C-alpha cells in the first residue's frame, strides 16, 4: 500500500486479525450485509444532520454568528488526512458545529483515525458526538443522565432526564480516541445519539481511555481465529482456507470455547480427535466427517398438545416488534404493522395477536383440549411480549408473565439443546436442512430483515416486494419450528448417536 495505514476504533473490537487483513488486502470490499449496515448507518447520520441547527433560534441572540461546517464524506486514508486538516481548520475558526469531522494522529506510537459524526463547540472546547443504530439509553425512573436535544446541539445546555445509559464498547473507544486526539480542546465528555435520533446523551469518557489504549497496544495475531462473526466478514474467504490449512481447533470450537483445549496444548482438530477427550473429541470427529448434528443418548421428550401454535416475532432494531406470526399446522396468520413502532400501531397489533392467541387457548380449554404455543429460542419473544405489556395498557403484564412461566409456552430450542449436539451450532437455519425443511428465502436473516423492514415502509413496488419477503420469511420460521419439534418427537430419526 502506498497510502498511510491508520487504525480505527472499530479495529480494536472483536477480531483483531481483521486489522492485519485490512492492511494487507485493501482491495477486498465489504460484503452485501456490510454494505447494508453501512447504508443504514448513513441514513441515520443523514437524519441527525437534518435535525441539527443551522442558525440561532429566537432567544439565542440571533445577531450572534452561528457557524456550521459540513464536511464531505471521506473513505481513503489520504482523504481522511485531508478531512483532519479541514476539521482542525474549522475548530480554529470557532465553528459551532462540524459534521463528518475526522481526527488523525499518533497514540502510543500507532497512527490512528477517528471519524466523529459531529463536533460541537462548548464553553470548554469541543464535544464529540457519535451516531449509531443501537440504543444508547433507556428510560428509567430510578436513573438520571444528561441529554441535549439534537436540534439544540451547539446552542442549548444539557438537560437532566430519567434514563439509564447503555454502554457499548465501540462507542466508548470512539469517544475515548476523540478525547485524546482533541488535545487541549477535549472536555472529558462525549455524546451518543442512538435509535432515538432526537437526543444526544452525554457521558464522561476519560474512563474509556485506559481500556482503549490497552486494546490499541495489544499485539495483532499472526494467524486467524474463527469467531462467531466470521461468517459475515469480508475476509472469511481468506481466513477459512488458512484455518483449514492449520487445522485450527477454532473451526470446531470457535472463539473462547477453544481456549481450554489450547491451554492443554491441543491446538488442532486432529489433535483433539486423537486425544480421545470424550464428547469434545466425538464432536471434532463428526465435524471432520461433515456430520452437522448428533443425538444424545436416551429417549427424547418434547411437550405436545391437542392444539398447537408455532410463533415467530420480528422486531425493528430495539424500537419495537412489528410482526407476530402464528402457524397452527394448517394456516399461517400474520399480525403485522408497517407503521412506526413504539406507538398506537404497535400496541394495536400486539393486542390483536395476544387476544387471538389467548382466544385459541381459551377455546381449547373450553373444549377439554390441551394447548401449547411454541417458539425457537424464546428470548426475543419473551422480551417483546413483556415490553409490550409494560409500554402499553391493553394487556396486563401479570397475564403475560404468567403465560411465559406456564407449561403452555414452550421454547423448542431448550429441548433441542437437551437432546442434540451441533458441530456448528444448533440454530434454526442449521437444523432446517437436517429435518428436511428449506426456506424459500434462505438468504434472509435478522440483519437483512432490518433492511427489508426499511424498504417495506417506503411503499411502491420495492416496498410491496419487501413486505411479501418478510411475511414469507416469518411464516417459514414458524413452519421450521414445527418441523424441528416434530422431528424430535419422532425420535430424531437418522441422526448418529453421540
List where the protein language model places each region.
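Metal-dependent nuclease catalytic cores that hydrolyze phosphodiester bonds in DNA/RNA
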Residues: 1-124
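N-terminal accessory regions of nucleic-acid-interacting proteins
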Residues: 28-30, 249-305
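Conserved DEDDh/DEDDy metal-dependent 3′-5′ exonuclease domain
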Residues: 94-109, 113-141, 147-211, 334-450
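A short beta-strand motif that forms part of the nucleic acid-binding face
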Residues: 131-135, 265, 328
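Short helix/loop capping segments that flank catalytic or ligand/cofactor-binding pockets
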Residues: 139, 241-242, 261, 270, ...
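Acidic, Mg2+-coordinating catalytic module of metal-dependent nucleases/exonucleases
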Residues: 176-198, 205-246, 431-498
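Generic beta-strand/beta-sheet core signal
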Residues: 275, 311, 374-377
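Structural signature for extended repeat/solenoid scaffolds and their inter-repeat hinge/linker regions
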Residues: 281-358
Amino acid at each position: 500500500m502506498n497510502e498511510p495505514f491508520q487504525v480505527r476504533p472499530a479495529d480494536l473490537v472483536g477480531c483483531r486479525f481483521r486489522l492485519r487483513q485490512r492492511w494487507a488486502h485493501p482491495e477486498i470490499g465489504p460484503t452485501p450485509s456490510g454494505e447494508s449496515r453501512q447504508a443504514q448507518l448513513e441514513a441515520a447520520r443523514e437524519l441527525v444532520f437534518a435535525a441539527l441547527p443551522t442558525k440561532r433560534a429566537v432567544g439565542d441572540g440571533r445577531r450572534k454568528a452561528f457557524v456550521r461546517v459540513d464536511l464531505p464524506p471521506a473513505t481513503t486514508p489520504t482523504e481522511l488526512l485531508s478531512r483532519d486538516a479541514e476539521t482542525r481548520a474549522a475548530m480554529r475558526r470557532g465553528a459551532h458545529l462540524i459534521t463528518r469531522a475526522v481526527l488523525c494522529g499518533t497514540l502510543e506510537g500507532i497512527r490512528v483515525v477517528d471519524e466523529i459524526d459531529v463536533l460541537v463547540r462548548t464553553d470548554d472546547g469541543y464535544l464529540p458526538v457519535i451516531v449509531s443504530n443501537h440504543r444508547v439509553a433507556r428510560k428509567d425512573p430510578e436513573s438520571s443522565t444528561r441529554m441535549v436535544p439534537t436540534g439544540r446541539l451547539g446552542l442549548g445546555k444539557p438537560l437532566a432526564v430519567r434514563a439509564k445509559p447503555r454502554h457499548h464498547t465501540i462507542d466508548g473507544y470512539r469517544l475515548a480516541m476523540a478525547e485524546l486526539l482533541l488535545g487541549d480542546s477535549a472536555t472529558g465528555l462525549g455524546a451518543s445519539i442512538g435509535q432515538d435520533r432526537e437526543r444526544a446523551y452525554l457521558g464522561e469518557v476519560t474512563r474509556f481511555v485506559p481500556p482503549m489504549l490497552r486494546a490499541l497496544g495489544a499485539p495483532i495475531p499472526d494467524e486467524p481465529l474463527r469467531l462467531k462473526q466470521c461468517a459475515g466478514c469480508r475476509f472469511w474467504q481468506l481466513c477459512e482456507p488458512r484455518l483449514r490449512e492449520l487445522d485450527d481447533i477454532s473451526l470446531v470450537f470457535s472463539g473462547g470455547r477453544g481456549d481450554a483445549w489450547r491451554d492443554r496444548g491441543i491446538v488442532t482438530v486432529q489433535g483433539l480427535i486423537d486425544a480421545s477427550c470424550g464428547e469434545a473429541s466425538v464432536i471434532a470427529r463428526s465435524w471432520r466427517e461433515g456430520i452437522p448434528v448428533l443425538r444424545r443418548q436416551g429417549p427424547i421428550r418434547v411437550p405436545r398438545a391437542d392444539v398447537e401454535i408455532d410463533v415467530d416475532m420480528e422486531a425493528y432494531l430495539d424500537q419495537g416488534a412489528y410482526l407476530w406470526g402464528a402457524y397452527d399446522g394448517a394456516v399461517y396468520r400474520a399480525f403485522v404493522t408497517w407503521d412506526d413502532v413504539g406507538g398506537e400501531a404497535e400496541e394495536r397489533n400486539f393486542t390483536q395477536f395476544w387476544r387471538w392467541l389467548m382466544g385459541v387457548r381459551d377455546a381449547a380449554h373450553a373444549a377439554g383440549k390441551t394447548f401449547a404455543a411454541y417458539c425457537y429460542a424464546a428470548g426475543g419473544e419473551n422480551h417483546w411480549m413483556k415490553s409490550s405489556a409494560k409500554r402499553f395498557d391493553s394487556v396486563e403484564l401479570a397475564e403475560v408473565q404468567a403465560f411465559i412461566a406456564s407449561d403452555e409456552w414452550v421454547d423448542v430450542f431448550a429441548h433441542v439443546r437437551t437432546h442434540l449436539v451441533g458441530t456448528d451450532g444448533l440454530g434454526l437455519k442449521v437444523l432446517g436442512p437436517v429435518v428436511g425443511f428449506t426456506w424459500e428465502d434462505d438468504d434472509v436473516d435478522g440483519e437483512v430483515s432490518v433492511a427489508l423492514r426499511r424498504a417495506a415502509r417506503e411503499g411502491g413496488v420495492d416496498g410491496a416486494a419487501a413486505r411479501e419477503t418478510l411475511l414469507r420469511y416469518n411464516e417459514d420460521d414458524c413452519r421450521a419450528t414445527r418441523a424441528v419439534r416434530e422431528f424430535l418427537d419422532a425420535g430424531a430419526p437418522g441422526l448418529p448417536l453421540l
